[in-house]
């Protein structure tokens, strides 16, 4: 008998999948206050429990389907493992049943963007594409979807990969590694190891050029991507091909799309595009497909999204910047495009991360860093004291940034932290930032967003 543990979106997708397969199961949510009444109506044949695992179930459970938010290190989960119970996740169930080519993407930053780019390119080439995992719908919902998909494109988090063992992919990538989720992992190496499992059974590993530097072991069959510039790149390398003095995205000696044709300019956007091209290598897509996608793709919400330009100041929502690596990348990318400097708004739940790298970026590129939220004082200890100011709330941070910013500057909201001290998630947090910008800046003088 299966136990579905965790009844959020992922757990509910597992219940739906089991119902479609006629598979009996138990269902547990470890939150004592969780209301199961609606789920009990939807799944009358399932026994539900909240809080702790009922002792009468223990001898009947062969396999636990663990939601990503529940760690395998939880005492009750470890006890079940020690008793010989299989512990898997929804992605493992998906892998066992998919039966179609899968492209899988993980990394500390850029996962959603690259996943979307790959999906858009394959759709443009005529494939029916199912997109899910850590983006959009849970992966198992793709299997019960009425569309008969030709290929699946999955964004996967380290939490999902912890409980995935038999995923076979036509192409897979670890886009990058930077410290994240140190409140869940004992060491950075554990986080890296979880990410690396995505490459265990792939036909094509797509890796950044600096993968050895970030501690990733070399797999067997691979292509690499990075910002090398050459008239002809080495075999199986994606980068910037120089042609008649112009920079093109391409591979080896093939110039595919001129950099100037991209709707999004900036080095990290070029890296995302190159990763997308490399992941599409098994499908042999045309240059015309790549160019159309990159000409029209303007980015995802809450990811270095310009929400207002007024009086020479650019206001940017990067609420999805939930770790130090993402925020440093955003600062560096945006600073390239400015005549002035960056005013950074950051803070929230720091997840026990090391913020020294952020401190270096603040020194080099920021006029000021405004910190708010639960861990602002902890973060402040690792940043240059002459460049930081502390406030309690995001609204206060926006008002303060307004007084500091000068023409040519950008106010970058890239928290480098999780959101759940003051917000439900990064989306609610980003929407709040945009609302404050409209309220305090745009509406005050009739600016246009």
Swiss-Prot record:
ATP binds at residues 107-113. Its EC number is 6.3.2.9. One of its GO terms (cellular component) is cytoplasm. It catalyses: UDP-N-acetyl-alpha-D-muramoyl-L-alanine + D-glutamate + ATP = UDP-N-acetyl-alpha-D-muramoyl-L-alanyl-D-glutamate + ADP + phosphate + H(+). GO terms for molecular function: ATP binding; UDP-N-acetylmuramoylalanine-D-glutamate ligase activity. It comes from the Bacteria. Gene3D superfamilies: Mur ligase, C-terminal domain (3.90.190.20), Mur-like, catalytic domain (3.40.1190.10), NAD(P)-binding Rossmann-like Domain (3.40.50.720). It holds the Pfam family Mur_ligase_M. Coiled coil: none annotated. Keywords: ATP-binding, Cell cycle, Cell division, Cell shape, Cell wall biogenesis/degradation, Cytoplasm, Ligase, Nucleotide-binding, Peptidoglycan synthesis. It is found in: Cytoplasm. Pathway: Cell wall biogenesis; peptidoglycan biosynthesis. Belongs to the MurCDEF family. NCBIfam families: murD. Cell wall formation. Catalyzes the addition of glutamate to the nucleotide precursor UDP-N-acetylmuramoyl-L-alanine (UMA). This is UDP-N-acetylmuramoylalanine--D-glutamate ligase. It comes from Hydrogenovibrio crunogenus (strain DSM 25203 / XCL-2). The gene is murD.
């Amino acid at each position: 008998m299966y136990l579905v543990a965790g009844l959020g979106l992922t757990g509910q997708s597992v219940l739906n999948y089991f119902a479609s397969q006629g598979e009996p199961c138990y269902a547990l949510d470890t939150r004592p206050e969780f209301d199961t009444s609606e789920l009990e109506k939807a799944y009358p044949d399932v026994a539900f429990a909240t809080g702790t695992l009922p002792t009468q179930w223990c001898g009947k459970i062969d396999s636990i389907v663990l939601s990503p938010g529940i760690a395998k290190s939880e005492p009750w989960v470890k006890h079940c493992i020690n008793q010989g119970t299989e512990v898997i996740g929804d992605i493992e169930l998906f892998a066992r049943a998919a039966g179609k080519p899968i492209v899988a993407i993980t990394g500390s930053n850029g996962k959603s963007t690259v996943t979307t780019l790959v999906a858009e390119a394959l759709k443009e080439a005529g494939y029916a594409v199912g997109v899910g995992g850590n983006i959009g719908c849970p992966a198992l919902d793709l299997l019960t979807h009425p569309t008969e998909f030709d290929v699946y494109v999955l964004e996967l988090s380290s939490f999902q990969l912890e409980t995935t063992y038999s995923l076979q992919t036509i192409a897979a990538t670890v886009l990058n590694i930077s410290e994240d989720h140190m409140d869940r992992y004992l060491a950075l190496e554990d986080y890296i190891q979880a990410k690396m499992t995505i490459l265990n059974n792939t036909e094509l590993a797509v890796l950044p050029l600096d993968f050895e530097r970030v501690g990733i072991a070399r797999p067997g069959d691979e292509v690499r991507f990075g910002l090398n510039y050459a008239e002809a790149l080495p075999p199986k390398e994606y980068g910037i091909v120089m042609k008649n003095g112009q920079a093109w995205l391409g591979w080896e000696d093939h110039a595919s799309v001129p950099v100037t044709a991209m709707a999004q300019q900036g080095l990290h956007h070029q890296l995302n595009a190159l990763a997308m091209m490399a992941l599409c290598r098994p499908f042999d897509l045309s240059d015309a497909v790549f160019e159309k996608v990159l000409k029209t793709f303007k980015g995802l919400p809450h990811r270095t999204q310009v929400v207002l330009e007024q009086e020479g100041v650019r206001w940017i929502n990067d609420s999805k910047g939930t770790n130090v690596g993402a925020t440093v990348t955003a600062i560096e990318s945006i600073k390239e495009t400015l005549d002035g400097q960056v005013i950074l708004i950051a803070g929230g739940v720091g997840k026990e991360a090391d913020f020294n790298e952020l401190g270096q970026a603040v020194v080099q590129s920021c006029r000021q860093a405004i910190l708010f939220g639960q861990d602002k004082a902890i973060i402040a200890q690792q940043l240059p004291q002459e460049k930081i100011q502390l406030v309690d709330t995001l609204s206060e941070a926006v008002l303060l940034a307004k007084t500091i910013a000068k023409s040519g500057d950008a106010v970058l909201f890239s928290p480098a932290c999780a959101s759940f001290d003051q917000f439900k998630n990064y989306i609610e947090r980003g929407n709040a930032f945009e609302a404050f910008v409209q309220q305090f800046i745009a509406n005050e003088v009739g600016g246009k967003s």
